[in-house]
């Protein structure tokens, strides 16, 4: 199944609410949903920093649960969902998504990582 097919499935199932496929230079090559005031480049920039400081997006603070160069998992302790990211293995970029609180952060990461693995250059 293609990236687009699996991404549509993840959106339809409620695993992803908003998502962006970003190049390493922060060009948006794919997106789904919208989030007023959210800037995916800010998320990517914060992810790449070595500090484990919270990420604030559109006025919501997300606490970092785990962060490596390949993985970002953060959650809003007020129950406003998660910001999750995975570096693509076959494409020089990143998949960054907001996932609802009904999906656990680690399950959300698993979904996003599987999608990121489907992205082809």
UniProtKB/Swiss-Prot annotation:
It is found in: Cytoplasm, Cytoskeleton. Keywords: Actin-binding, Cytoplasm, Cytoskeleton. It comes from the Archaea. GO terms for cellular component: cytoplasm; cytoskeleton. Belongs to the Asgard profilin family. Binds to actin and affects the structure of the cytoskeleton. At high concentrations inhibits spontaneous rabbit actin nucleation. This strongly suggests this archaea has a profilin-regulated actin system, and actin-type genes can be identified in this organism. This is Heimdall profilin. The lineage of its organism: Archaea, Promethearchaeati, Candidatus Heimdallarchaeota.
């Amino acid at each position: 199944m293609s990236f687009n097919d699996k991404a549509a499935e993840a959106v339809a199932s409620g695993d992803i609410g908003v998502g962006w496929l970003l190049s390493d230079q922060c060009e948006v090559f794919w997106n789904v949903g919208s989030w007023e005031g959210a800037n995916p480049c800010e998320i990517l920039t914060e992810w790449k920093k070595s500090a484990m400081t919270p990420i604030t997006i559109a006025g919501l603070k997300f606490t970092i649960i785990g962060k490596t160069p390949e993985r970002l998992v953060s959650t809003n302790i007020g129950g406003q969902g998660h910001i999750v990211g995975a570096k693509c293995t076959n494409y020089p970029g990143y998949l960054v998504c907001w996932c609802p609180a009904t999906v656990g952060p680690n399950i959300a990461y698993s979904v996003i990582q599987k999608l990121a693995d489907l992205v082809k250059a």
